[in-house]
Regions:
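The feature captures the beta-strand-to-loop junction immediately N-terminal to the Walker
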Residues: 33-35
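Helix-to-loop junction immediately C-terminal to a conserved catalytic motif
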Residues: 48
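Conserved ABC ATPase "signature" region
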Residues: 98, 105-123, 175
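A short, proline-enriched helix->beta-strand linker immediately N-terminal to the Walker B motif
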Residues: 146-150
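Catalytic Walker B motif of ABC-type/P-loop ATPase nucleotide-binding domains
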Residues: 152-155
């Protein structure tokens, strides 16, 4: 269980996060949305222990997070800067496993399984510059899942890919969640994406930020890019989230 307790974060005079309290249960897909600049990235940085909060705390299974916990992996928007250009897909995915004290054969197994899960087995020995943007982001996702995190933090991971690739990567995330069962915290600007992927949607207010609303997504677990997005419940929920964000923006 990941718990955020009365978290606040200021940068000098700028109060980015005012007071956030929220819990993330094991195995849940949580989408985090909110107006531009409301502090979504700041929240993820505090959650991951990369940035100390000004007040409150983040606790993972009751223990205060002060540095990136071993059980967490992160995927960022900018895949082109997160992969090592001189390493192949296989080497990039294996990189974080080097310090886990695993046998070489186990590393090979985890890497090959993760690369297969993201559909890149055919490209495992290619370098990042030989891959499309979507394939590079798949490599980042494979690197995160090979690490076998309990919690996966993703900061607008699909913002830089085209619409078709984005839809494919969304479906990839649903299959990864079903296969590995990790807790996922997924920051997105895209309201449709948040409703399509989420078990829950955490709507943040504008800065100084609090949690404005937490919605449970009542859609069936099995989702489909066409039929789910035609479902009246989907349409109702996306309008609701959109109104919430407009209201947050208006202050
Ligand atoms: N290192 C920093 N120093 C000073 N101010 C910062 C820093 N990082 C973030 N901020 C400020 O904190 C607020 C929240 O920024 P943050 O990037 O977390 O928002 P966001 O919701 O992720 O933004 P976006 O929607 O544009 O992705 C903004 O006002 C930003 O200018």
């Amino acid at each position: 269980m990941l718990r955020v307790e009365q978290l606040s974060k200021s940068f000098g005079q700028v109060e980015a996060i005012k007071d956030i309290t929220v819990e993330f249960a094991q195995g849940e897909f949580n989408c985090i949305v909110g107006p531009s600049g409301c502090g979504k990235t700041t929240l993820l940085k505090c959650l991951s222990g990369l940035m100390p909060p000004t007040g409150g705390r983040v606790a993972l299974d009751g223990v205060t997070v002060t540095r990136p916990p071993k059980q967490m992996a992160l995927v960022f928007q900018d895949y082109s800067r997160s992969l090592f250009p001189w390493m192949t897909v296989r080497q990039n995915v294996a990189f974080p496993l080097r310090n886990k004290g695993l046998a070489k054969s186990e590393i090979t197994r985890l890497v090959e399984e993760a690369v297969e899960a993201v559909g890149l087995t055919h490209a495992i020995d290619r370098y990042p510059w030989q891959l499309s943007g979507g394939m590079q982001q798949r490599t980042s996702i494979a690197r995160a899942i090979a690490y076998q995190p309990e919690i996966l933090l993703m900061d607008e991971p699909f913002a830089s890919v085209d619409a078709q690739t984005r839809a494919n990567l969304e479906d990839l995330m649903l299959s990864i969640k079903a296969r590995y069962g990790m807790t996922i915290l997924f920051v997105t600007h895209d309201i449709d994406e948040s409703v399509y992927l989420g078990d829950r949607i955490v709507v943040l207010s504008s800065s100084p930020t609090v949690v404005q609303e937490i919605l449970t997504v009542p859609l069936p677990v099995a989702r489909d890019q066409i039929t789910t997005k035609e479902d009246p419940q989907f349409l109702h929920l996306r309008s609701h989230v959109f109104r919430e964000i407009m209201a947050a923006q208006a202050g």
